[in-house]
Amino acid sequence: MRIGILGGTFDPIHFGHIRPALEVRDKLNLDRVWLMPNHIPPHKASTCVSTEQRLEMVQLVCDQYDEFDLCDIEAKRDTPSYLVTTLKQLRDEHPNDEFYFIMGMDSLVSLPTWYEWRSIFTLCHIVVSERHGWCLNPDSAIYEEYEHRLTSTNQIPSQSTGLIIPIEIAPQPYSSTEIRHQLFNGIIPENALPSKIIKFIQHNSLYQAPA
């Protein structure tokens, strides 16, 4: 199978995660998209709710959208979530599948700071969600790698790993930080969250502390 992977804290999961993942799936004709909550993200100090609660929210989204599956491989760890470690484990467990890791251009730019970042290209393709008109700075540390591995959505990959596939994604004006801020102030961001997530947050009195 051809499987997309979208990782994140999902604190909380919102349409800014869901809609781009669906777009990537459709444009690349992927079989599935796995939503993969982090446990202890290396680039973030902590999350606002427990790992178990974030897993429950992601599972609610997977129950609503047949295209998604919950991947809890990182959430089960007691150590920081490094992508290369996760991908090695997934490749061992699913040797016949191709993985397409989905990230924003901001994450791609910072990729050279990630743990064993070059090894990531031996384990998956990288799908980069782009904003219209955005161009990668030639002075960026990732620029040479980007130019070397770049391919397009209308080219069928002849290899199972190692490509960078840019996809223009419809802008989503949602931010987890802003959503948490609204919830703390008693505002329900109905346009940003699926109804099941809103009900879960209200039932469990989540995000009652400042974001």
Curated annotation (Swiss-Prot):
Pathway: Cofactor biosynthesis; NAD(+) biosynthesis; deamido-NAD(+) from nicotinate D-ribonucleotide: step 1/1
SUPFAM superfamilies registered for this protein in UniProt: Nucleotidylyl transferase
Homology family: Belongs to the NadD family.
Name of the gene: nadD
Protein species of origin: Shewanella sediminis (strain HAW-EB3)
Source domain of life: Bacteria
Descriptive protein name: Probable nicotinate-nucleotide adenylyltransferase
Role description: Catalyzes the reversible adenylation of nicotinate mononucleotide (NaMN) to nicotinic acid adenine dinucleotide (NaAD).
PANTHER family: NICOTINATE-NUCLEOTIDE ADENYLYLTRANSFERASE-RELATED, PHOSPHOPANTETHEINE ADENYLYLTRANSFERASE
The protein's Enzyme Commission number: 2.7.7.18
Catalytic activity of the protein: nicotinate beta-D-ribonucleotide + ATP + H(+) = deamido-NAD(+) + diphosphate
MF annotations from Gene Ontology: ATP binding; nicotinate-nucleotide adenylyltransferase activity
